[in-house]
Amino acid sequence: MNIIVAVDSKWGIGRNNGLLFNIPEDMNYFRTMTKNKVVCMGYNTLLSLPDAAPLKNRINIVLAPQGVEREDLIVVHSLNELFTALKNYDDDDVFVIGGGMFYKTMLPYVKNVYVTEVYSDGKATVFFENLSENPDYLKTYLSEIKSYKDIKFRFVLYENLSPEVYSFS
C-alpha cells in the first residue's frame, strides 16, 4: 500500500478542506501514479472533490460515517471493513490520498510514501508527519528540483522500513 501526498516546507498538506498548491506537473504526477489503481480516502476528502464525485479511471474507496452509502464508489465504515475490501486488490496498486486524519491512521501500514515536497509555506492548517525526521522511513528517491511560476518542488519517495500488518479486531 502507498500514500501519495504534497507537502509544503512545514509538512503542511491542506487548508479549508483544500489543497495548498495547484502545480500542473504535480497534478499530472498524481494522475499518472493513481490511474487504473485503487484510491482510498476519508469522507471529507471525497467531499472536497468537484461535485463530491469519485476520481475517474480509479477504484474509489471511502471511509465514511455510518449512514453514508453511495452507488458510484465503495463505502466502508471502519478500518476492519477497509482492510477487508483491500484484500481484493494488489497492495502495490492501493494509494491513500487523504485527508490528514486518514493519512495519520494509514501511515503505519503503507510501504511507500510518494511525496511532492514544495519549498514554500502554504499556510497550512492540516499537517503530515515529517518523514525526514522519522527513522522508520528511508528516503530512496529524489527527483531534480523543478519549478512552476515562483514555486520550487521535487518528487521524493520514502520507504517504510517496517510496515505494520493490520490486525482485525
Locate predicted features:
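Enzymes that bind and transform nitrogen-containing heteroaromatic metabolites
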Residues: 1-169
